Curated annotation (Swiss-Prot):
Subunit structure: Component of the CCR4-NOT complex.
Molecular functions (GO terms): 3'-5'-RNA exonuclease activity; metal ion binding; poly(A)-specific ribonuclease activity; RNA binding; RNA exonuclease activity
Record Pfam families: CAF1
Species for this entry: Xenopus tropicalis
UniProt cross-references to PANTHER family, sorted A to Z: CCR4-NOT TRANSCRIPTION COMPLEX SUBUNIT (PTHR10797)
Role, per record: Has 3'-5' poly(A) exoribonuclease activity for synthetic poly(A) RNA substrate. Catalytic component of the CCR4-NOT complex which is one of the major cellular mRNA deadenylases and is linked to various cellular processes including bulk mRNA degradation, miRNA-mediated repression, translational repression during translational initiation and general transcription regulation. During miRNA-mediated repression the complex also seems to act as translational repressor during translational initiation. Additional complex functions may be a consequence of its influence on mRNA expression.
Superkingdom, natural source: Eukaryota
Chain residues that bind a divalent metal cation 2: D40, E42, D230
Record key words, sorted: Cytoplasm, Exonuclease, Hydrolase, Magnesium, Metal-binding, Nuclease, Nucleus, Repressor, RNA-binding, RNA-mediated gene silencing, Transcription, Transcription regulation, Translation regulation
Name by which UniProt lists this protein: CCR4-NOT transcription complex subunit 7
Family according to the record: Belongs to the CAF1 family.
GO BP: any one term: negative regulation of cell population proliferation
């Protein structure tokens, strides 16, 4: 299979409250032929650490994720659609959903907001024209994109990304126990390939998404640290890696459903002493 490529005529569609319904109709059509969905989110950093005793480092990392996702709001979601051959839909391949976010009322980490602002995110527009998450969830649940075993999700170091999606889809805080989180995850997203987890089997690949893309000689489209561009690059990286390192076949038993840094696949540092939360919150994706 040729390496997955996207020419510059492919474009990212910006979605706000005013065009959400129309764009979700388009996605319902696209998902029928392009059933690989590369995903990324942007969120306002990490503002809290859990306190108390934890059964393991993995438990600490999940509780860190849970307390921050429960406290904070998603800012952007990027979805890129690809078919089995690594081909993108003609015209629009990527949708960037911009959610309601208010810098006066909502919690955030200052360094994360500064990074996102410098990347071109327009917080005033998010406040005035952003999508309500509850209405998005209603449309998303019936889109054919979630709850479908035929849809394959592609992500990069995505514990927080899926955490925010589960919070939106369930309209509730994340479960207290990590095993329950993974049960809900499998319900909504039965097939997931986390590119960062796949990298464990790819000799010499290292770093964040941008660094990996450069090693794979992929060209980014759109601004870094925006969810649409990052989801597009995630999809490109997956198909290039599948070709180069996996002979165009991913072993589901070994790789499907694992999120880098969570569960038995945890690659985080010692409990409470490292910068794992900073790596995830400020990941180059």
């Amino acid at each position: 299979m040729p390496a997955a490529t996207v020419d510059l005529s492919q474009r990212i569609c910006e979605v706000w409250a005013c065009n959400l319904d129309d764009q979700m109709k388009r996605i319902r059509q696209v998902i029928r032929k392009y059933n690989y969905v590369a995903m990324d989110t942007e969120f306002p950093g990490v503002v809290a650490r859990p306190i108390g005793e934890f059964r393991s480092n993995a438990d600490y990392q999940y509780q860190l994720l849970r307390c921050n996702v429960d406290l904070l709001k998603i800012i952007q979601l990027g979805l890129t659609f690809v078919n089995e051959q690594g081909e993108y839909p003609p015209g629009t391949s990527t949708w960037q959903f911009n959610f309601k976010f208010n810098l006066t009322e909502d919690m955030y980490a200052q360094d994360s907001i500064e990074l996102l602002t410098s990347s071109g995110i327009q917080f005033k527009k998010h406040e005035e024209e952003g999508i309500e998450t509850q209405y998005f969830a209603e449309l998303f649940m019936t889109s054919g994109v979630v709850l479908c075993e035929g849809v394959k999700w592609l992500s990069f170091h995505s514990g927080y990304d899926f955490g925010y999606l589960i919070k939106i889809l369930t309209n509730s805080n994340l479960p207290e126990v990590e095993l329950d989180f993974f049960e809900i995850l499998r319900l909504f997203f039965p097939v997931i390939y986390d590119v960062k987890y796949l990298m464990k089997s790819c000799k010499n690949l290292k770093g964040g998404l941008q660094e990996v893309a450069e090693q794979l000689e992929l060209k980014r489209i759109g601004p870094q640290h925006q969810a649409g561009s990052d989801s597009l690059l995630t999809g490109m990286a997956f198909f290039k890696m599948r070709e180069m390192f996996f002979e165009d076949h991913i072993d589901d038993a070994k790789y499907c459903g694992h999120l880098y840094g969570l569960g038995s696949g945890s690659s985080y540092v010692q409990n409470g002493t490292g910068n794992a939360y900073e790596e995830e919150a400020n990941k180059q994706s």
